[in-house]
């Protein structure tokens, strides 16, 4: 008898009652719920901001690969198109990476073999970029590009002040 009394009310009341009924049964899902359901580990944050007369839906992802972020942006935009009644008529969609901690601990260097890194040496201001080629007990070997020629250079771990991952 849930729907028996609805016919006596306006369309708006019908919509509200139907919405509450479906929500209780778990049939209606908000855009946030849908996005978090589809991308539980990917979405870091969903926020609305307003600047002057413009509304921005900002979605921050746990992803650093630009190509993947572009793919996810298209997918998320398509999902949001199905929720246009729930969203403002005009808004800007801003999807970005939350970034990463680029600092690498010496104990974790094994995870960065054959990856592009940058090191800072103790008592030197110049940073050296290269591919982490080999890891030994007390040293690392970087494959460094010197004017178009690659050279493998060995650095003592205790002479390295900071190691950072380089995103190309």
Swiss-Prot record:
<comment type="function">
    <text>Required for maturation of 30S ribosomal subunits.</text>
</comment>
<comment type="similarity">
    <text>Belongs to the RimP family.</text>
</comment>
<keyword id="KW-0963">Cytoplasm</keyword>
<keyword id="KW-0690">Ribosome biogenesis</keyword>
<dbReference type="GO" id="GO:0005737">
    <property type="term" value="C:cytoplasm"/>
</dbReference>
<dbReference type="InterPro" id="IPR003728">
    <property type="entry name" value="Ribosome_maturation_RimP"/>
</dbReference>
<dbReference type="GO" id="GO:0042274">
    <property type="term" value="P:ribosomal small subunit biogenesis"/>
</dbReference>
<dbReference type="InterPro" id="IPR036847">
    <property type="entry name" value="RimP_C_sf"/>
</dbReference>
<dbReference type="InterPro" id="IPR035956">
    <property type="entry name" value="RimP_N_sf"/>
</dbReference>
<dbReference type="Pfam" id="PF02576">
    <property type="entry name" value="RimP_N"/>
</dbReference>
<protein>
    <recommendedName>
        <fullName>Ribosome maturation factor RimP</fullName>
    </recommendedName>
</protein>
<dbReference type="InterPro" id="IPR028989">
    <property type="entry name" value="RimP_N"/>
</dbReference>
């Amino acid at each position: 008898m849930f729907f028996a009394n609805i016919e006596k009310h306006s369309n708006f009341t019908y919509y509200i009652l139907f919405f509450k009924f479906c929500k209780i049964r778990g049939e209606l899902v908000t855009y946030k719920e849908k996005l978090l359901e589809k991308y539980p580990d990917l979405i870091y944050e969903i926020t609305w901001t307003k600047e002057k007369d413009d509304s921005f839906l900002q979605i921050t992802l746990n992803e650093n690969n630009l190509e993947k972020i572009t793919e996810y942006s298209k997918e998320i935009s398509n999902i949001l198109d199905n929720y246009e009644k729930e969203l403002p008529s005009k808004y800007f969609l801003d999807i970005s990476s939350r970034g990463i901690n680029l600092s690498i601990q010496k104990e974790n260097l094994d995870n960065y073999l054959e990856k592009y890194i940058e090191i800072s040496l103790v008592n030197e201001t110049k940073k050296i970029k290269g591919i982490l080629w080999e890891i030994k007990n007390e040293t690392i070997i970087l494959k460094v590009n010197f004017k178009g020629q690659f050279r493998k250079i060995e650095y003592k771990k205790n002479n390295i002040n900071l190691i950072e991952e380089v995103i190309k």
